[in-house]
């Protein structure tokens, strides 16, 4: 990272955060407008927004959660903070077709939270989350552990937090996105930096089938979560490799512009290619 100047660090950060927002949504089958994501990020990071469209409330809420998780990583993770993230993700209470209660734990009204497959009447239940009346207690136990002094490696803590929260499944919707934000918060603590030059969500989306398969096998497999930990650490390693390549591309582009500014003539078409 030392090879990056201030402008290049900002470019790298916006690029990675944009990809993170797009991919954590894509994992759940949602497609966001990349320019709206960049617009929301730029505004919150004090960067120029000229030419960018105003973001939707949903995009703004996702970006708000992501930045709060990574840039306020040292702050305690509380019920109020989690509920605030959920309210930001669903500012109008879900979609017109599927309404949910925003900023609240699930209740009896939402019914059992199950992961199923198969035709109606012949469903196969892969996993069933704790019942609604256990959610508050499960969350308190999770937060007590998460905020206590670490007794495991912080990267392992990130993997544990991701799995634990998504297994509680405390919300009607958005559990995956919130669990990945919690994992990013734990990784930011491990990195001891609020700057992120890799995207775990981008790598998870690339390995989406393996991600869901490993979650299912681990949730059905009792108390041994070794397989999940091994997969998560491998995925993180691949995310770091991917991030390194992205940063290297930014460094190459910056070096090219330095040579151009030193007097090498280029036309508009060449400039457009360099900016791409």
Model-derived regions, located:
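FIC/Doc superfamily catalytic core
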Residues: 1-276
């Amino acid at each position: 990272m030392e090879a990056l100047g201030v402008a290049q660090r900002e470019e790298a950060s916006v690029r990675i955060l944009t990809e993170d927002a797009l991919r954590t949504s894509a994992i759940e089958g949602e497609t966001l407008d990349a320019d709206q994501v960049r617009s929301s990020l730029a505004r919150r990071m004090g960067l120029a927004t000229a030419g960018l469209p105003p973001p939707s409330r949903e995009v703004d809420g996702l970006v708000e959660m992501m930045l709060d998780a990574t840039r306020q990583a040292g702050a305690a993770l509380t019920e109020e903070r989690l509920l605030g993230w959920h309210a930001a993700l669903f500012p109008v209470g879900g979609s017109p077709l599927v309404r949910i209660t925003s900023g609240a734990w699930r209740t009896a009204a939402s019914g059992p939270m199950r992961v199923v497959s198969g035709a109606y009447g012949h469903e196969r239940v892969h996993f069933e989350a704790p019942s609604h009346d256990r959610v508050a207690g499960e969350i308190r136990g999770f937060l007590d552990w998460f905020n206590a002094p670490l007794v495991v490696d912080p990267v392992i803590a990130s993997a544990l937090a991701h799995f634990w929260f998504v297994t509680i499944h405390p919300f009607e919707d958005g559990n995956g996105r919130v669990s990945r934000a919690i994992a990013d918060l734990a990784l930011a603590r491990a990195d001891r930096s609020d700057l992120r030059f890799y995207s775990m969500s981008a790598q998870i989306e690339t390995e989406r089938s393996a991600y869901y398969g490993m979650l299912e096998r681990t949730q059905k497999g009792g108390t041994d979560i070794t397989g999940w930990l091994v997969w998560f650490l491998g995925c993180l390693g691949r995310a770091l490799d991917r991030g390194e390549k992205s940063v290297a591309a930014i460094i190459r582009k910056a070096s090219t512009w330095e040579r151009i500014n030193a007097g090498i003539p280029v036309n508009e078409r060449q400039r457009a290619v360099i900016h791409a």
